[in-house]
């Protein structure tokens, strides 16, 4: 079993227990992709679900030996809810581990939104931050898309990933699903429009700045990569365009 497969397995167990899951359509050619790189197979697998309040729950898992392991796990709410996104980027490269966990806010600087979705998880963040050293600087342009409870760390030991990071991942996911259970739909037209704009802004940023783009291009080529990013990983823009045609 790879380093991040237990994370995905636990996520699926938690999601199955707490949500009414249904399959989310994965475009042809994206469920599994394989390339031979320097004599070693690099395999990318995709899984996805949806639920009554969550538009897309999806995971991209990359396995290329012990020095290349990635799990990108993102939950996108339906446009009728002002829920934050759930984001987990778990990356192991030859240079070490890079871990990012957060509930990315739609309206980061809105005090009412912070009180609703960020302040309740600050104690959880503080509890895990005590054992996971801050990972250092990250791009200034990314700051609007992360909450004050953003857990960003570069563990030196794989054992830390298997224990401390795993525990943080499960706790953050359960806390997010607590928010989902309590979420009520937005009904005011202005509020719905604001939610859609905020979701599109976040997903556009993620698609344009996806740090995996270079890796995927090297492994699978630019055409497959761009279609994978825009047609599956961050697909809201594409889906909205299809609806309005």
From Swiss-Prot:
The lineage of its organism: Bacteria, Bacillati, Cyanobacteriota, Cyanophyceae, Gloeobacterales. This is Phycoerythrobilin:ferredoxin oxidoreductase. One of its GO terms (molecular function) is phycoerythrobilin:ferredoxin oxidoreductase activity. It comes from Gloeobacter violaceus (strain ATCC 29082 / PCC 7421). Catalyzes the two-electron reduction of the C2 and C3(1) diene system of 15,16-dihydrobiliverdin. It is an enzyme of class 1 (oxidoreductase). Belongs to the HY2 family. Keywords: Oxidoreductase. It comes from the Bacteria. It holds the Pfam family Fe_bilin_red. It catalyses: (3Z)-phycoerythrobilin + oxidized 2[4Fe-4S]-[ferredoxin] = 15,16-dihydrobiliverdin + reduced 2[4Fe-4S]-[ferredoxin] + 2 H(+). GO terms for biological process: phytochromobilin biosynthetic process. Its EC number is 1.3.7.3.
């Amino acid at each position: 079993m790879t380093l991040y497969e237990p994370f995905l397995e636990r996520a699926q167990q938690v999601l199955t227990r707490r949500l009414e899951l249904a399959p989310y359509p994965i475009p042809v050619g994206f469920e599994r992709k394989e390339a031979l790189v320097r004599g070693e197979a690099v395999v990318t697998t995709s899984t996805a679900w949806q639920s009554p309040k969550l538009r897309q729950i999806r995971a991209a898992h990359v396995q290329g030996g012990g020095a290349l392991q990635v799990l990108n796990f993102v939950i996108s709410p339906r446009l009728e809810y002002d829920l934050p996104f759930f984001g987990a980027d778990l990356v192991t490269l030859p240079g070490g581990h890079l871990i990012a966990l957060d509930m990315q806010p739609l309206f980061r600087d809105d005090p009412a939104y912070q009180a609703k979705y960020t302040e309740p998880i600050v104690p959880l963040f503080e509890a895990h931050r005590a054992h996971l050293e801050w990972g250092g600087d990250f791009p200034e342009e990314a700051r609007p898309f992360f909450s004050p409870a953003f857990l960003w760390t570069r563990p030196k030991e794989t054992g830390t990933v298997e224990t401390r990071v795993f525990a943080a991942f499960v706790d953050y996911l359960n806390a997010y699903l607590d928010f989902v259970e309590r979420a009520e739909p937005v009904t005011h037209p202005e509020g719905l429009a604001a939610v859609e704009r905020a979701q599109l802004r976040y997903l556009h940023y993620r698609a344009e700045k996806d740090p995996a783009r270079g890796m995927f291009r090297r492994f699978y080529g630019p055409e497959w990569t761009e279609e994978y990013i825009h047609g599956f990983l961050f697909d809201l823009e594409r889906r909205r365009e299809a609806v309005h045609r």
